[in-house]
């Protein structure tokens, strides 16, 4: 009787994927359209901007707070369930505060504090299920990107056919569905900590690898600031139509999905360090090419294909490295730091800095992004050595 040479353990693929799908579906519903809803209530651009800024502050604080709570709790998943239920219930307050600006802002931000702040903690649940098969992470995480894309498209269709007034009902429904998805998942017992990750006397803050990872991933997210904040405007100034702009964004999302799907193949053959270095240098090339090929749709399309590298590959490697570099007692804080400092702080700072350079020269803002990404690559190459990263720096034996 024949058996698989390397049978893969059973992983609750669809239950895990469902959480990522609905987390990103909530984002895909709120990010593009919540300002339109606020405008329909009669609020000014300044007021909607205030709400956006406060939500960004929330994404900087909430992950670390929840990381501390989860690391101290007996069950990480129970905290995730409770937090997501709280997010859904708090969001219901929005319906009572349409005409009360600050109460509305408080309800939206408090809800976001719960569900967005817990995203990093579910990464640990997923990685614990994967165990010795972290290469399978991408095929679970890709459903998050698919959820975001689906929500953006479907919500836009609903708003066009009916009214933006339906938006809070859609968000509330998605939040409750997200909570239900956490109920069908289960905790996975944590495996014994490898010798290479023994808890250090000084705790998480005395870990030099953690500090290096924070710097590298902060910089690469910082380099995305001009892209996330000004890419559409950049294309418009180059005379590219809105339809073509939408197509270019779609190419990037498609590349993101594809890269998540094929990451297991790469991770079977290359070390995380090698994947990271290649991704960082290609990210720098992407931003440099974007500035140099402004107005050339064919070249810009090819460059958008690199989004799978600059986002999907980088994110996958980051999640795994932040887990591997700390003791299990600090996993929640490590993932929270990545989410808050690198993603939240890096992108926010990148948008702000990119805006300042944009005022001088739009093209220069992308050259600046290229320099930042190249700097991240050089730091990773020089200081995140194979010996320092341990198993993550060596070729995978999967």
Over which residues does each language-model region extend?
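Juxtamembrane intracellular "pre-TM" segments in multi-pass secondary transporters
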Residues: 2-10, 185-217
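Helix-loop boundary and gating motifs at the non-cytosolic
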Residues: 6-56, 209-217, 221-248
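Hydrophobic core of transmembrane alpha-helices in multi-pass small-molecule transporters
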Residues: 21, 90, 101-119, 218, ...
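Conserved MFS/SLC helix-loop-helix module at the cytosolic interface between two early adjacent transmembrane helices
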Residues: 61-98
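Structural signature of the two symmetry-related core transmembrane helices
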Residues: 78-92, 274-289
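Cytoplasmic helix-loop-helix junction between adjacent transmembrane helices
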Residues: 108-143
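Symmetry-related core transmembrane helices of the 12-TM Major Facilitator Superfamily/SLC fold
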Residues: 166-183, 365-383
């Amino acid at each position: 009787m024949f058996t698989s040479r390397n049978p893969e353990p059973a992983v609750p693929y669809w239950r895990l994927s469902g959480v990522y799908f609905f987390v990103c579906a909530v984002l895909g519903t709120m990010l593009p359209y919540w300002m339109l809803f606020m405008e329909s209530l009669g609020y000014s651009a300044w007021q909607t901007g205030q709400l956006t800024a406060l939500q960004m502050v929330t994404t900087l604080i909430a992950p670390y707070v929840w990381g501390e709570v989860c690391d101290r709790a007996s069950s990480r998943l129970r905290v995730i369930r409770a937090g997501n239920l709280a997010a859904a219930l708090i969001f219901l307050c929005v319906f009572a505060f349409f005409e009360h600006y600050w109460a509305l802002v408080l309800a939206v931000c408090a809800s976001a504090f719960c569900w967005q702040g817990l995203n990093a903690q579910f990464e640990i649940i997923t990685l614990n299920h994967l165990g010795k098969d972290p290469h399978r992470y991408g095929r679970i995480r890709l459903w998050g990107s698919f959820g975001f894309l689906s929500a953006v498209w479907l919500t836009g269709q609903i708003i066009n056919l009916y009214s933006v007034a339906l938006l809070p009902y859609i968000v509330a429904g998605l939040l409750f569905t997200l909570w239900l998805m956490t109920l069908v998942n289960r905790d996975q017992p944590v495996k014994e900590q490898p010798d290479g990750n023994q808890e250090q006397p000084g705790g998480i803050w005395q870990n030099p690898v953690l500090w290096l990872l924070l710097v590298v991933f902060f910089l690469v997210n910082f380099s995305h600031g001009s892209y996330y904040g000004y890419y559409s405007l950049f294309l418009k100034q180059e005379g590219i139509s809105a339809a073509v702009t939408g197509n270019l964004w779609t190419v990037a999302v498609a590349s993101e999905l594809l890269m998540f799907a094929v990451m297991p193949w790469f991770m079977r053959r290359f070390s995380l360090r090698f994947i990271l270095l290649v991704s960082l240098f290609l990210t720098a090339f992407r931003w440099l090419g974007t500035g140099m090929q402004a107005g050339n749709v064919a070249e810009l399309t090819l460059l958008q294909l690199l989004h799978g590298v600059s986002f999907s590959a980088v994110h996958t490697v980051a999640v795994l490295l932040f887990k591997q570099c700390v003791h299990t007692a600090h996993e929640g804080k490590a993932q929270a730091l990545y989410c808050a400092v690198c993603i939240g702080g890096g992108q926010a700072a990148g948008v702000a800095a990119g805006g300042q350079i944009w005022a001088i020269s739009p093209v220069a803002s992308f050259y600046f992004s290229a320099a930042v990404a190249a700097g991240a690559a050089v730091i990773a190459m020089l200081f995140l050595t194979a010996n320092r990263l341990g198993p993550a720096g060596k070729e995978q034996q999967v």
